[in-house]
Regions:
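Secondary-structure boundary elements
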Residues: 38-49, 84-100, 171-173
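Short glycine-rich, low-complexity/disordered patches
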Residues: 44-56, 95-109, 222-238
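TerminUS-proximal long segments
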Residues: 184-241
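Glycine-rich, often proline-containing surface loops adjacent to acidic residues and nearby aromatics
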Residues: 8-21, 54-74, 162-163, 188-197
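Metal/cofactor-centered catalytic core regions of large enzymes
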Residues: 135, 148-149, 162-166, 203-206, ...
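Aromatic/basic-lined ligand-recognition segments
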Residues: 64-153
């Protein structure tokens, strides 16, 4: 299955070449979910899905969500193009780390694009408490030290931001000097943030984003005393251009 934001549909393709499509458009989540599951059944794919959205308080299960919602094709296309541009920089940043690192991936619950580096050292149990997200999953995800960065499109009064945090937060991390100048520490979020607008309007957006990713990682790794010589590698000049 894949989301096609050129034709604005969901493609379901099997290894035998059978193909089904479900249009992306205005409507209810319940109807969309029902259409996707019906197409899967027609292909002989019987799958169980946990239908309550994760990381969202007071979430409505997909099949019960009958609120009509709009679909702005132009806004979706712009958002997708932005994510593709960010992914390129995130992957370049990821390539200079030889330790364990997540892929550049998208979290549907919090709706953020992220990449996470691991030091290899254990971390204290995560406190959990994320809405509609099992505590044991949070504890497993944060069982080892991480430095994580990503992009969040905002919501609930917050503008779009790039973010960077460390778990557990090492002493002094929040006082580190990071780049670019528009980057600041947020006590509310417990992480460094950089307004999306600061990157979008920069003379060199790629360089501005890379400066944020690298400087916040440097701050986390130094404060937590990661074995940086073992975990990092230098990219050839042509790979960084």
């Amino acid at each position: 299955m894949r989301l096609d934001f050129v034709n604005h549909d969901v493609e379901i393709e099997t290894t035998t070449g059978e193909l089904r499509r479900v249009d992306l458009g205005p409507g209810t989540v319940g109807n969309f979910y029902g259409s996707v599951m019906a197409q899967l059944r027609q292909l002989g794919i019987d799958v169980e899905v946990y239908t309550t959205p994760s990381e969202i308080a007071d979430a409505t299960p997909f099949e019960k969500d009958d609120e009509h919602r709009p679909y702005d094709r132009e806004a979706v296309t712009r958002f997708w193009h932005a994510l593709v541009s960010m992914q390129r920089v995130f992957n370049q940043f990821r390539a200079s780390f030889r330790g364990k690192c997540s892929p550049v991936h998208f979290f549907w619950g919090s709706f953020d694009l992220a990449v996470t580096r691991f030091s290899g050292k254990g971390a204290p149990p995560h406190p959990g408490g994320v809405p509609n997200f099992p505590d044991w999953v949070a504890r497993e995800a944060y069982s080892h030290e991480v430095s994580s960065a990503g992009f969040w499109p905002g919501g609930n009064g917050h503008d779009a931001i790039f973010y960077s945090y460390a778990y557990p937060k090492p002493d002094g991390f929040e006082r580190a000097s990071v780049r670019p100048d528009a980057a600041t520490w947020s006590d509310e979020l417990g992480e460094f943030v950089l307004p999306y607008s600061a990157v979008r309007e920069a003379d060199d957006p790629d360089a501005a984003l890379m400066a944020f990713l690298q400087s916040t990682y440097d701050a986390a790794a130094d404060a937590a005393e990661w074995d940086r010589s073992a975990l990092e590698c230098r990219l050839p000049e042509d790979a960084r251009s």
